[in-house]
Curated annotation (Swiss-Prot):
The protein, known as: Glutaminyl-peptide cyclotransferase
Organismal lineage: Eukaryota, Metazoa, Chordata, Craniata, Vertebrata
Role, per record: Responsible for the biosynthesis of pyroglutamyl peptides. Has a bias against acidic and tryptophan residues adjacent to the N-terminal glutaminyl residue and a lack of importance of chain length after the second residue. Also catalyzes N-terminal pyroglutamate formation.
Tissue distribution of the protein: Expressed by the venom gland.
Disulfide bonds: 143-169
């Protein structure tokens, strides 16, 4: 009971402190004129973030802890976890358990389906975690949790896909944990526009090909879910709008965790959101909040353009969803090798990128 009282007092203090942050200079209120918009599916195109000031950036970044993330979230995921394997089940249970234990009260669902593969029919399970299912619009942060299948090796090694994509999974879980109070505050807000915009985390199964990448042997989870969301009415009872139209922005994380990543712009129609990541990176650097970081090795480079690469965003892109693809170019040197393991991860880089992503999410959700 004493613990519950302390938690209650801490939550009350947090809400007061966060409300004070909202009142400080540098936190513009939500964009005026939204009340005049009739078609909510178009609001994503005029949506503007609320820029966090230095005070709140310091508060937000103090809440995240890369060592705790490493122990509590990354280690349990750094196992062989190809679709249908015991490791896949264990990781799926871990992700659900971590999200279900948070104050914010996420709705955590498994989207299970069967699909034909080069090895016959296999069962796949996506994990969809929604902060507020009643909200019309959702910022989506996504990654895949499966690891690529490799036949048994003579030396007994297994592929654990540290950058591909254990680290993105752990970053998303840490985001949900470290921002738990802000997200609880958002969910409890009953006034527009906050009530109409929320957060969704998606962990895809079956991103990797079993044999060779092809339209039929890859992206099993995202192909299935995009099709399902394109045919599921949203909000419930709607006749002409569907879940996929409720995606404001689809942010996909992949191949993250190696040192000195470079993220280029893949889609010009979301370049303004990429620009926010670049600006947040600079702000955190100016505040001395990035570890082992050199401004000469900037992560996000809006002056660098690359052709899109195939990944879990493709089925959503084809249905008109705005995409922000956070995958480095070039890929990590350990990509699809047994060396994509914990030894070759760079903890300061992961910590820095986690901070940038968390600030970005708060700004997008107008929680600044």
């Amino acid at each position: 009971m004493a613990r519950e009282r302390r938690d209650s007092k801490a939550a009350t203090f947090f809400c007061l402190a966060w409300a004070l942050c909202l009142a400080l200079p540098g936190f513009p209120q939500h964009v005026s004129g939204r009340e005049d918009r009739v078609d909510w599916t178009q609001e994503k195109y005029s949506h503007r973030p609320t820029i966090l000031n230095a005070t709140c950036i310091l508060q937000v970044t103090s809440q995240t802890n890369v060592n705790r993330m490493w122990q509590n979230d990354l280690h349990p995921i750094l196992i062989e976890r190809y679709p249908g394997s015991p490791g896949s089940y264990a990781v799926r249970q871990h992700i659900k358990h971590r999200l279900q234990g948070l104050q914010a009260g996420w709705l955590v669902e498994e989207d299970t389906f069967q699909s034909h593969t080069p090895y016959g029919y296999r069962t796949f399970s996506n994990i969809i975690s929604t902060l507020n299912p009643l909200a019309k619009r959702h910022l989506v942060i996504a990654c895949h949790y499966d690891s690529k299948y490799f036949p048994p090796q003579l030396d007994g090694k297994v592929f654990v896909g540290a950058t591909d994509s254990a680290v993105p999974c752990a970053m998303m879980l840490e985001l949900a944990r470290s921002l738990d109070r802000q997200l609880s505050f958002l969910k409890q807000s009953s006034l527009p526009p906050k009530a109409d915009l929320s957060l969704k985390l998606i962990f895809f199964d079956g991103e990797e090909a079993f044999v060779r990448w092809s339209p039929s042997d890859s992206l099993y989870g995202s192909r299935s879910l995009a099709q399902k969301m394109a045919s599921t009415p949203h909000p419930p009872g709607a006749r002409n709008t569907y879940q996929i139209q409720g995606i404001d922005l689809f942010v996909l994380l992949d191949l993250i965790g190696a040192r000195n990543p470079v993220f280029p712009v893949y889609f010009l129609n979301t370049a303004r959101w990429f620009g926010r990541l670049e600006a947040i990176e600079q702000n955190l650097y100016d505040l001395g909040l990035l570890n082992n970081y050199s401004s000469e090795r900037q992560y996000f480079r809006s002056n660098l353009r690359r052709h899109p690469v195939e990944d879990d965003h493709i089925p959503f892109l084809r249905r008109g969803v705005p995409i922000l693809h956070l995958i480095p170019s070039p890929f990590p040197r350990v990509w699809h090798t047994m060396e994509d393991n914990e030894e070759n991860l760079d903890k300061p880089t992961i910590d820095n990128l986690s901070k940038i992503l968390q600030v970005f999410v708060l700004e997008y959700l107008n929680l600044g």
